[in-house]
Amino acid sequence: FFVVFPELGSPPAWTQESLEALNARDIEYNGQKCTRYEISQMQRARERAVCKWKRRYLAEDAAGADTTASAMKLRQARQSLADFTRATGGRVDSARTSVHGFGRSEGSKASYAARKQERFNAANTELQQMREAGTIKAKGRLIESPSAPNEINFASDHVLQRWAERGMGPMDAERIIRSSKVAMSQRNGTQTCYYSELGFVAIGQDGNVSSIGPLDEGGKKLMEVVKKHGIPHS
């Protein structure tokens, strides 16, 4: 029965036909027949995920933290929602995925960060395959070149010997670092090897240069992978 409040009007009139339609398992998803209610709950879960990662992105951005991971999660959540509605014949209601403070500008920045990271992920996958095949020897994870340490130390006897062997000096190292757009994060992040068309320079967190040289065949192949995946390199 329905409790009737006259000021609210008549109670909803559910017909047997409308109830049967609501409970009918007539929507197929992922190989199963689902009711409209079940589908709506699955969609709400995906909409909540989009909102969650929008809020996380805003919080990290406001704190000056790296937003790459949350941007990637947001992109995945949006894609999951879009795929779900496409598969079930539904539609995305932007009102249910709206988060205060996350507008067009924030959406564009998050999408750009996610696309850039996807390129690096794809390049790292290919580099690992080349490493396993013995095509390249360079170890580490391909990243966007970070800022170099404020002070760079070239005093190592090993580095000085390498300079002599390869005809390179401190000015070459500085030019490579300035022109570098990509690097390899090595030794659990304690060393960064900067790459550019001019060569490579490996620098520790303490600013000590551990190696320097022109691009060998492996280095050239690494840069080819960078170009292939549309990552800025010069």
Where are these regions (language model features)?
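Ribonuclease/tRNase effector modules and their secretory precursors
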Residues: G107, S111-S234
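Activation/maturation switch segments at domain boundaries
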Residues: F1-A133
